[in-house]
């Protein structure tokens, strides 16, 4: 993390002494009636939050299994540019005058979400982000 430009703009080994190191890490648990419904985290610097939020929306609101939610195309807004993977409809954004940064394929730029979920029927699912070589496997006991 010391060399991470987003977290340490002064450069490697130049973090001010005595100051807490900033972090974008945000391990997340979504609970339903006090029990875990979805747990997830991601790599990806300042894109972590958008990757996690989009995965949560796809599982909780759209009802996708964790793997399908993790694999789904993502979008990220930064510095006035909307970055989008294939599968994101950018036409409304373009009509609104937004600058678009298009990617030709899924890309590690959009984070690396790892997720485990339990649906309303108690079925487990997992997702390991293909953008960063992730893998998930549900083992029935």
Regions picked out by a protein language model, each given a short descriptive name:
Residues 1-104:
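Proteins synthesized as precursors that undergo proteolytic processing into mature forms
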Residues 64-65, 81-84, 90-141:
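Terminal-appendage/accessory-domain detector
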